[in-house]
Every structure is written in structure tokens, then in C-alpha cells.
Amino acid sequence: PMWVRRTLTWMSLHAPDLRVPHGLAPARISHDRAVVKAYRSDPLVRRRMTGRLARFVDEGGRESLREADLLPCRTLLMVAGDDSIVAAEGSRQFAQRAPAQLLTLRWYDTAWHEIFNETAPISDPVYADLDEWLARTAQALSLPPVLTPSAQEAGTP
């Protein structure tokens, strides 16, 4: 929301190191309740942010969009389509501006923020897409096959 952006801009200029609650809703990071519970009890999770950090994130996102056409390497962009933590639409905008021959976009309509820590019906296609992209990219670059944890568990190359 615009009021949040204005508040964080003011903070970054007048109180850049003041830590305030970020207001992110942990209940919406994953459909898997165990993941949410682990997140809530993790002492390393920071529940506050500074105006300086907010400005850095905002400016970094804008710069990424401005310079998307300069993407120098093959990239797999995997997006949670129902993400309430970050604006998924920004990823779509980035993909539209990046060189099409270098960027592969995979969009998961019902996924929340933690696409690799979702329930199986949601995360299975995520891991399958990653496995496929890594194999295709390794083959194109004449590299030996790469096994992700999900491919190793399945016993597939």
C-alpha cells in the first residue's frame, strides 16, 4: 500500500535505524501448518525491520525491473502466485522485460511464499520443474547431470 511506502520512505530519511514490526503474516507463508509453526518458533526469524532495510528492498526491486533486460545468464524464476508477503506481479513484470532466451518463468497459482516448503500437491510440481530446468540447463551447457534432493530421493538422474 502507498501509505506503507510513504511511511518507510520517511523512516529511511529520518530514522533509518529505528526497528519496527514488519507486519508480515506468517500464517500465509505456507499451506503446511508445520512450516508455519516452525517459522513462528524460529529464534533466527526477525520480526522487525528498519527504514533503511525497507528502502534497500524497495530500491533493489525497482532497479531489478529497470535492468531486467541486462540479465546475463540462464535463470529459472519460480513464483508463488498467491503470495501475500511479496508482490508476485513484480516477478511477472521482470519476466516480461528479461531476455526471453535466458529466462524461464514458472508460476504456481495457489502457492504461498515458501514454494519449496508447501504441501505436496503444491510443492511436487515446484520440485519437478526445478529438476527439469536443471537437467535441461546442464545438458545445454554440457555439464554432468545435477540431482536435486527430490530427484535423489526418487532415484532418478
Residue ranges and their predicted role:
Residues G51, A87-S91, T119-A120, Y127:
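Conserved strand-to-helix beginnings and helix N-cap segments that scaffold or border functional pockets
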Residues T104-P157:
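Catalytic active-site module of serine/aspartate enzymes centered on a nucleophile-bearing elbow/loop
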Residues C73, A87-R97:
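Short alpha-helix in the alpha/beta-hydrolase fold that links the catalytic acid
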Residues L71, L77-V79, D83:
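Short beta-strand/loop motif that positions the catalytic acidic residue
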Residues M49-E67:
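Active-site nucleophile elbow and catalytic-triad environment of alpha/beta-hydrolase enzymes
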Residues P1-T50:
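Alpha/beta-hydrolase-fold enzymes
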Residues R46-R47, A54, D82-V86:
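Acidic catalytic loop of the alpha/beta-hydrolase fold
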